Amino acid sequence: MSRTGQTLVDMPEATVKVLADFPDFVLTYMRSRSEGGPGRHLHRQHVDGFIVLEGEYAFELGDQRNAESAGTALVIPQRVIHRYEHETTEQGAFLNIHAPGCDFANYLFGETPPGDADNIFEPPEEEGRPASEATVLRFAEEGEVVTDRSERTIRILADLPELCLTWTRYVADEEGPGPHIHKEHLDAFFILTGELNFGLGPEVERVTARPGTFVLAPPDVIHTFRNDGPAEATWLNFHAPSKGFADFLRDNDFVWDSFDAPA
């Protein structure tokens, strides 16, 4: 059973919500006003990622420890030893990505043991890959720029087989792709600023997504989007697994897992 949309904790001190729970992708929202974090660990089978939305967190990658504030994306590949810690009682919040999901949502709810969810705590230091293999960047300012025009900007933040993560900016009235589907991966969006107008499902039903809104199209679900304005819009886009999305952004003639909506 999928835990998409379920809330584990919601109190003044903390909130933990499962935004998506799929075999290829788990996304959670976590907010905290208390200190603490998990111990050092690694994942052998999946990628772990963090999008800091509010406040500041200390992240350890290997033997490096740095404070990362709102607007930072971290993507941590398999076998990089890591942990995070909220060091203050001021509010912080982040999105946490697991790709593939490895039953992480059930682990949060206490239904799956850590090892069965690919969470290896106190790992042998010699097993760890170099911290330099992780990605840490300011998602509105850094990354691989593949499009930068007055009407839109697209940056690739991470390009791994398990996950492609991008940051995009559209001005008002900018159109996205027409109605389409993906057959072998899911496509998801988290709105940062402004609004996007999505068309979803067989009837391309229109939905307005404002800041903080999460939208996910599983395989074979028709979707399209545009910015109807009045303001500029920015968002994060997740493709899991990546299925060639980054290569398509670099070369629009590249054939990848995207198809026109069925008639």
Regions inferred by a protein language model and the residue ranges of each:
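Residue-level detection of beta-strand-connecting loop/turn positions
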Residues: 13, 63, 151, 202-204
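A short, N-terminal "cap"/entry segment at the start of jelly-roll beta-barrel domains
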Residues: 1-28, 39, 111-166, 178, ...
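A generic "binding-loop/recognition-motif" signal
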Residues: 45-46, 64, 80-81, 90, ...
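Asparagine-centered strand-capping/turn motif at beta-strand->loop junctions
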Residues: 84-87, 226-227
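A short hydrophobic beta-strand segment most commonly corresponding to one strand
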Residues: 75, 89-106, 216, 230-247
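Conserved short histidine dyad/triad with adjacent acidic residue
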Residues: 28-43, 166-182
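Short acidic-glycine-tyrosine-enriched beta hairpin
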Residues: 64-78, 203-219
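Glycine- and acidic-residue-biased ligand/ion/polar-headgroup-sensing regions
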Residues: 45-57, 184-196
